[in-house]
A protein has these predicted regions:
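NAD(P)H cofactor-binding loop motif with strongest signal on the N-terminal glycine-rich segment
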Residues: 151-152, 220, 243
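Glycine-rich phosphate-binding loop and adjacent beta-alpha segment
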Residues: 175, 223-293, 325-328
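NAD(P)H dinucleotide-binding glycine-rich loop of Rossmann-like/cofactor-binding domains
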Residues: 49, 88-153
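Mid-domain Rossmann-like dinucleotide-binding core that forms the NAD(H)/NADP(H) cofactor-binding site
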Residues: 122-197
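N-terminal glycine-rich beta->alpha transition that marks the start or flank
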Residues: 3, 15-18, 24-70
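A glycine-/small-residue-rich N-terminal strand-loop-strand element
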Residues: 37, 50-51, 70-94, 170
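C-terminal hydrophobic helical "lid"/dimerization subdomain
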Residues: 2-3, 275-328
């Protein structure tokens, strides 16, 4: 009997209401592939960007959204040696995760820690891997530094704040509403700024005695651009990893005024070799296991409600991580 799967698909780019829940016949796995019956899939800002046509990956339409999932292998194609039916497996950066079952290349899989449930796996790994290359590779944060982290109560901002604090940095965090202050403080922020009510750059300069910060971690994008330039110290690093309000309007002449360095990195270039990926995964597993980073899952959505999750993301009112969970 042919296996059926429900998916969240878009046929056009647009707002959250372009997402359609559809039922597909699932093909048999081909050589080097498996069928994964999923327990959970991550809901990332990248999924929203893809839905809007603003992500660097633009698979042909129509397409199933989602990049990260975990579940149990239901069938194995020819030539797959490392996995068998019944194994638990997860994957990163493979388009099509919003599905209760799907075909996945075996080479994209990894074995998640046994002590993490499905929702925690998809809430943890891409976000913590991103935090690793932002904090440990692009600009290695040092003890005693004062740094700026935007969206300090959100899924990524929370991890950046927690990890940077554990490294000895003093984090100035921005949030979009007063009800996010407590979350940002619990994450470790020494100072919290509501950027909708205060000029965050003025506040940062006041906190640092006019010196500015050596690095800003930004996923806001256009709306925070001018303030980031003012908040940075000379030769500071402007690390952008998202653009919730649109891409930052980078101007080389403006960067030149203070010899600023702008970077927007991709994880693929930070795990370009098996050795780099193994080293990153080792550190990521360690900081999750020892509690350096704590995953706060604030929204669990059934597949049929995935549009509601995207609406929440787009409104920039969320804290913590969002996941979609699938029925057994």
């Amino acid at each position: 009997m042919t296996m059926q799967t429900r998916v969240a698909r878009i046929h056009e780019y647009g707002d959250f209401d372009v997402i359609r829940i559809e039922t597909d016949a699932l093909p048999d796995p081909g050589p080097g592939e498996v069928i994964l019956k999923q327990g959970a899939a991550a809901i990332h800002f990248a999924d929203s960007y893809m839905r809007q046509g603003r992500y660097f990956l633009k698979p042909p339409l129509p397409t199933v959204l989602g990049l990260e999932g975990v579940g149990t292998i239901a069938a194995v194609g020819d030539g797959v040696a490392d996995y068998t039916e019944g194994d638990r497996a997860a994957y990163l950066f493979n388009v099509g995760a919003y599905a209760d079952a799907r075909v996945v290349p075996a080479e994209a899989l990894y074995v998640p820690p046994v002590d993490l449930d499905d929702a925690t796996v998809v809430a943890a790994f891409v976000r913590t891997m991103t935090a690793q290359y932002l904090l440990r590779q692009l600009y290695p944060v040092a003890s005693g530094e004062t740094i700026l982290v935007h969206s300090a109560a959100g899924g990524m901002g929370s991890l950046l704040t927690q990890w940077a604090t554990s490294l000895g940095a003093k984090v100035v965090g921005t949030v979009s509403s007063p009800d996010k202050f407590l979350t940002a403080e619990e994450n470790g922020c020494a100072h919290v700024i509501d950027y909708t009510k205060e000029d965050f750059a003025d506040q940062v300069l006041d906190i640092t005695g006019g010196a500015g910060v050596p690095v800003v971690y930004d996923a806001v994008g256009a709306d925070a651009y001018e303030g980031n330039l003012r908040a940075l110290a000379p030769r500071g690093w402007f690390v952008n990893y998202g653009h919730a309000s649109g891409p930052p309007p980078i101007d080389a002449l403006e960067l030149n005024q203070k010899s600023l360095i702008f970077t927007k990195a991709s994880m693929k270039d930070c795990v370009a070799t098996p050795e780099e990926k193994a080293a990153m995964m080792e550190e990521v597993v360690a900081v999750i296991a020892d509690g350096t980073v704590k995953l706060n899952i604030t929204g669990r959505y059934e597949l049929a409600c995935i549009g509601e999750a995207h609406a929440a993301l787009d409104s920039r009112t969320t804290t913590g991580a969002l996941v979609t969970v699938f029925e057994d």
